[in-house]
Regions:
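Acidic loop->beta-strand submotif enriched in PP2C/PPM serine/threonine phosphatases
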Residues: 1-35
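Residue-level signal for the start and early helices of compact helical domains
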Residues: 6-8, 116, 127, 158
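C-terminal catalytic subdomain
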Residues: 19, 31-116, 142-146, 150-156, ...
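Residue-level marker of motif borders
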Residues: 23, 79, 124-125
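Short beta-strand segments
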Residues: 25-27, 128, 219-221
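Conformational gate/switch positions in structured elements
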Residues: 29, 85, 129-132
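Active-site beta-strand/loop microenvironment that shapes enzyme catalytic pockets
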Residues: 109-140
Length: 263
């Protein structure tokens, strides 16, 4: 069907879709890419389709797919685009929850309740913090095996491994880096080229929260670690709480559904 909007003829199509279907729209700056540079006649639509299909993996986010095409356009323009180039991508996917646990509860007697609620949730499980991971290990009657490999970023403490948990990491240092990545993601100074390929704990959390998850449940303990207090914050307000609040705001701007539960 067609209709007129602001003097423009808009063509509309309605059709069934399946999971992992991808829709890509682009301005003519994409098809002009390379004119006067690498390609005499620009980057033809058929060639863009071939490029998108050749570089597609089922786990690729819509942002990654669109960014990959834009990067190739910039390469064909040799860094000097002759036209504005916009690419939009939509990927059809099921909702995928991720649950993140950080910090022991303010009242130690609430630990079992906190763990029961956390481990009853559907989806992947991330546990952050040494004390928190030990509480989780006691609840599951499992042991934590800490990796001796710092991954690709030696500034981030090593991850751990525990049966029943998808990812075990250190707390404040790791989460601070995740917030840094989230801020860059939202504000346009994107660091995806770092966290999307690195193997440290912060990068793995970023991959799960930014790319994999659609719904994120935070389970946050309000016990205060004196080593992490900031003199600019009230004594009852831990740094981890501020980190989670800031991260939640960035994740919501990414379109994620966020729920935060405090204990």
């Amino acid at each position: 069907t067609t209709r007129q909007i602001a003097g423009k003829t808009i063509h509309e199509s309605r059709f069934p879709v399946e999971e992992n279907d991808v829709f890509i729209a682009m301005s003519d700056g994409a098809t002009y890419a390379g004119v006067g540079h690498a390609l005499n006649h620009g980057w033809q639509r058929e060639n863009i389709i071939d490029f998108a299909e050749a570089n597609y993996l089922p786990g690729n986010s819509a942002k990654y797919i669109a960014g990959n095409i834009v990067d190739e356009c910039n390469r064909l323009y040799e860094g000097e685009p002759g036209d504005d180039t916009t690419v939009a991508a939509v990927r059809i996917r099921e909702r995928t929850p991720v649950n993140l646990l950080m910090g022991p509860p303010a009242d130690p007697r609430d630990a079992t309740k906190m763990m029961t609620l956390f481990f009853s949730k559907e989806g992947k499980k991330i546990v952050c913090g040494g004390t928190t991971s030990q509480i989780a290990a006691d609840y599951l009657h499992e042991t934590i095996v800490t990796s001796l490999d710092y991954g690709t970023d030696p500034a981030i403490p090593p991850v751990g491994h525990m049966k029943g948990v998808d990812l075990v990491t250190e707390g404040v240092i790791t989460m601070s880096r995740v917030v840094e990545y989230a801020k860059a993601f939202v504000e346009g100074t994107d660091l995806t080229n770092l966290w999307s390929v690195q193997t440290d704990g912060a990068s793995q959390i970023a991959q799960l929260l930014f790319e994999y998850a659609t719904d994120i449940n935070f389970f946050i303990g309000k016990a205060i670690n004196p080593a992490h207090q900031n003199p600019d914050l009230p004594i009852t307000f831990g740094i981890k709480i501020r980190l989670v609040q800031e991260l939640s705001e960035y994740l919501e701007k990414m379109g994620k559904q966020i729920k935060v539960s405090y204990f």
